[in-house]
Amino acid sequence: MIGKRKEEHIRIAENEDVSSFHNFWDDISLMHEADPEVNYDEIDTSVDFLGKKLKFPMIISSMTGGAEIAKNINRNLAVAAERFGIGMGVGSMRAAIVDRSIEDTYSVINESHVPLKIANIGAPQLVRQDKDAVSNRDIAYIYDLIKADFLAVHFNFLQEMVQPEGDRNSKGVIDRIKDLSGSFNIIAKETGSGFSRRTAERLIDAGVKAIEVSGVSGTTFAAVEYYRARKENNLEKMRIGETFWNWGIPSPASVYYCSDLAPVIGSGGLRNGLDLAKAIAMGATAGGFARSLLKDADTDPEMLMKNIELIQREFRVALFLTGNKNVYELKFTKKVIVDPLRSWLEAK
C-alpha cells in the first residue's frame, strides 16, 4: 500500500503541474556590482553545515524510497551527491519500518560516499493515529540503515488533510521530538507550506538542530494529492486539494523568519543557482533541490549530473556578479524585494 502510494507520488510529480501559483524567489533581486573586484577562479563555494563540510551549499532534498523505482532514483542521486560534495536526504522511511524487504530502496545510497545523509520520518508517525506511533527502536533502525548524520522529521499535515488515507492527529509531536532529540540530530522539514517563526521557536526549544523550510513556491502536496483523489473520483478530497493548493508561507519568507534561530535549508521552488544565491542572501545556510532533479534522476543520470553542474556554475556567477568571494559574504548582499513577498516579510 505505502509502496504503491510512493510510486504514484513520483509519477504525478514528474508528469503533472503540481507547482504553487507563484514562485516567490522571483520577488527578490540581488544588487549587481559592475566591478566585482573578485577573481572568479578563487571563489570558495564550500560551507560547514552543523559540522559537515560541503563543497557547495546544496542539499538534494528528501524525495523518495519504499518503491522499486525509487531504488534507481536514490542510487543516481547519491552518485551525484558524492561527485559534487553535497548533502542528500531520502524520502519517508516508514515503508522500511513496515516492510524490511524494501530497505534497499533507501540503503542503496550507501554505495556512494555522500558527505551528509539525512534519514526521514513523518511527524504524524511520531504520535498515535489509528496505529501505534513508531518506536525509538524503529527510528534507530532507519537512522542506521543509511548511516545517517541527521533525521528529518517531515511536517506534511496539509498533505494528510487532502490524502484519502491521511492522518489527523498532531497532538504530542513536540513532546516526542524532545524525547528523540537527545539521541538523534533532528532537522524539522516542511513539505511545501513553510514554517512560521512561532512553530520554529517551539521546535528549536524541543531540541531541533536545523530547519528545512520547504515553503510555498515549489511543489505543493495538496496538488499531488488532488491528482490522486481525482484518479479515485474522491470529490471531497479533490475539493480540499483545490482549495488549499496554494496554502502556506512563501519559501523566502520562511527562511527570513527562521534563520536567526538555527541553520536553515532554504527549499521550496529553487530552480537554479541564482535562486540558491537568493536563498543564501535571505539567511539560509544551504539550499534544497527536489522536483527539479527528480525526472533526470529517474530517467537520465547524465543529465542529472549536467543539471547540478549548471546549478553550481550559476551560483558561482551570482557570487561573482554581487562581488562576493565566498558563501558567507553573500549573506550581506543588498537585495531588492517586491510584493507579494515584501508583505510576507513584514509579518515576521
From Swiss-Prot:
This is Isopentenyl-diphosphate delta-isomerase. Its main location: cytoplasm. GO terms for cellular component: cytoplasm. One of its GO terms (molecular function) is oxidoreductase activity. Belongs to the IPP isomerase type 2 family. Involved in the biosynthesis of isoprenoids. Catalyzes the 1,3-allylic rearrangement of the homoallylic substrate isopentenyl (IPP) to its allylic isomer, dimethylallyl diphosphate (DMAPP). Substrate binds at residues 5-6, 92-94, 159. CDD domains: IDI-2_FMN (cd02811). It comes from Thermoplasma acidophilum (strain ATCC 25905 / DSM 1728 / JCM 9062 / NBRC 15155 / AMRC-C165). FMN binds at residues 61-64, 92, 120, 189, 214, 219, 269-271, 290-291. Gene3D superfamilies: Aldolase class I. Pfam families: FMN_dh (PF01070). It is found in: Cytoplasm. Keywords: Cytoplasm, Flavoprotein, FMN, Isomerase, Isoprene biosynthesis, Magnesium, Metal-binding, NADP. InterPro entries: Aldolase_TIM, FMN-dep_DH, IPdP_isomerase. GO terms for biological process: isoprenoid biosynthetic process.
